[in-house]
From Swiss-Prot:
The lineage of its organism: Bacteria, Pseudomonadati, Pseudomonadota, Gammaproteobacteria, Enterobacterales. The gene is allB. Keywords: Hydrolase, Metal-binding, Purine metabolism, Zinc. Zn(2+) 1 binds at residues 59, 61, 146, 315. It catalyses: (S)-allantoin + H2O = allantoate + H(+). It is an enzyme of class 3 (hydrolase). Transmembrane segments: none annotated. The modification N6-carboxylysine is found at residue 146. It comes from the Bacteria. Catalyzes the conversion of allantoin (5-ureidohydantoin) to allantoic acid by hydrolytic cleavage of the five-member hydantoin ring. This is Allantoinase.
Length: 453
């Protein structure tokens, strides 16, 4: 058989091993894995490179339509491709209107036409005002539903995202359980975090350490414990977003051991930044839950290596620079991190701490694809989409603002020396990013809908 593409001599991350092997691609799919596979129209030599499944980033905010001056499909997905992401799962908030019904998700699809460099799946929102319309989003094909039990949204904008109270969460989870959809939750105690934050501002405590103190670990743990129980009673699968503390992970592990259907994610910034660095970097490193101290970070690494965290995600949530101005308590909370998930974590987890390549592949791609039912994604295996990222190990560079593809070229990682490089990203058999050529093809990404899987 003649193939469209053969990738030769790379160290390939397979599901349970990594070895030097060739990959054949035909019609955008992985056709064969082995040696001496035959002829191809194109042959790529990946000698000295790690060939990983393209990252499946299960937590991104693109903000289009309505807030494309924050981030947009064109810039956001180019940054993703440059960072080795081939599939993103987009959150239902930051854009206007929030993605909470059929009409709003159709606006998303229209806004993305001709702009997607990578593939995308979409989450719907569970908010205080759409519990009777959740089925609309399920019918369109979302792969899950996001909600906040922490305070969110601009009360001055009618169609912005809104948090839910316990009753609304429970009723929504019941409906989502009936639909067979997971609920994804931002877990922080709204009343306590809001009160502590207001108290700090009144008293003039506005440093990074003050911000972290206003959102203590127990507020995350309490919220995780609460939604675990409510989701269990409601009969709904639960995914806990961006866990920042080992104590929070322990709640998920305990529930899982008791038989509950629950998964969780965390983000690179909780593993590579700490509160002292947050103080130095400033508002660009503000997020919630917040970046915590070194002892907390050490515990998170232990949980990651123990297999208690299912996947790593960017939680890419940028905004215009003026919203990051002023003191840390007042600035927008969100990190621009889409472009540097894979290289930073390959350096920190694999090269510096000895994580196995198969575990890295699961954390960056396989597990997220499985959690959200993306059956063609997340694995290098025959029949799957030919989505790959080439990683050059032990190749250090210093990240600059000019390296970034975001609408606003800022990131808390600027100035960081990163010890690995993404050299090529391939989506369904086509090179969508190359370190020398840039972006050689027109945007070819498409939306992945649940009912098409």
């Amino acid at each position: 058989m003649s193939f469209d593409l053969i990738i030769k001599n790379g160290t390939v991350i397979l599901e349970n091993e990594a070895r030097v092997v060739d990959i054949a691609v035909k019609g955008g799919k992985i056709a064969a894995i082995g040696q001496d596979l035959g002829d191809a129209k194109e042959v790529m030599d990946a000698s000295g490179l790690v060939v990983s499944p393209g990252m499946v980033d299960a937590h991104t905010h693109i903000s289009e339509p309505g807030r494309s001056h924050w981030e947009g499909y064109e810039t956001g997905t180019r940054a993703a491709a440059k960072g080795g992401i081939t599939t993103m799962i987009e959150m239902p908030l930051n854009q206007l209107p929030a993605t909470v019904d059929r009409a709003s998700i159709e606006l998303k699809f229209d806004a993305a036409k001709g702009k997607l460099t990578i593939d995308a799946a979409q989450l719907g929102g569970l908010v205080s005002y759409n519990i009777d319309r959740l089925h609309e989003l399920d019918e369109v094909g979302v792969v899950g539903f996001k909600c906040f039990v922490a305070t969110c949204g601009d009360r001055g904008i009618d169609n912005d995202f809104r948090d839910v109270n316990d009753w609304q969460f429970f009723k929504g989870a019941q409906k989502l359980g009936e639909l067979g959809q997971p609920v994804l939750v931002h877990c922080e105690n709204a009343l306590i975090c809001d009160a502590l934050g207001e108290e700090a501002k009144r008293e003039g405590r506005v440093t990074a350490h003050d911000y972290v103190a206003s959102r203590p670990v127990f507020t995350e743990v309490e919220a995780i414990r609460r939604v675990l129980y409510l989701a269990k009673v409601a009969g709904c699968r639960l995914h806990v977003c961006h866990i920042s503390s080992p104590e929070g992970v322990e709640e998920v592990t305990r529930a899982r051991q008791e038989g509950q259907d629950v998964t969780c994610e965390s983000c690179p910034h909780y593993f590579v930044l700490d509160t002292d660095q947050f103080e130095e970097i400033g508002t660009l490193a503000k997020c919630s839950p917040p970046i915590r101290d070194l002892e907390n970070q050490k515990g998170m690494w232990e949980k990651l290596f123990n297999g208690e965290i299912d996947c790593l995600v960017s939680d890419h949530s940028p905004c215009p620079p003026e919203m990051k101005a002023g003191n840390i308590m007042e600035a927008w909370g969100g990190i621009a991190g889409l472009q540097n998930c894979m290289d930073v974590m390959f350096d920190e987890a694999v090269q510096k701490r000895g994580m196995s390549l198969p575990m890295f592949g699961k954390l960056m791609a396989t597990n997220a694809a499985d959690i959200f039912g993306l059956q063609q994604k997340g694995r290098i295996a025959p029949g799957k989409d030919a989505d790959f990222v080439f990683i050059q190990p032990n190749s250090s560079y210093v990240l600059t603002n000019d390296d970034l593809e975001y609408r606003h070229k800022v990131s808390p990682y600027v100035g960081r020396t990163i010890g690995a490089r993404i050299t090529k990203t391939i989506l369904r058999g086509d090179v969508i990013y190359d370190i020398e050529q840039g972006f050689p093809v027109a945007p070819k990404g498409q939306f992945i809908l649940k009912h098409q899987q």
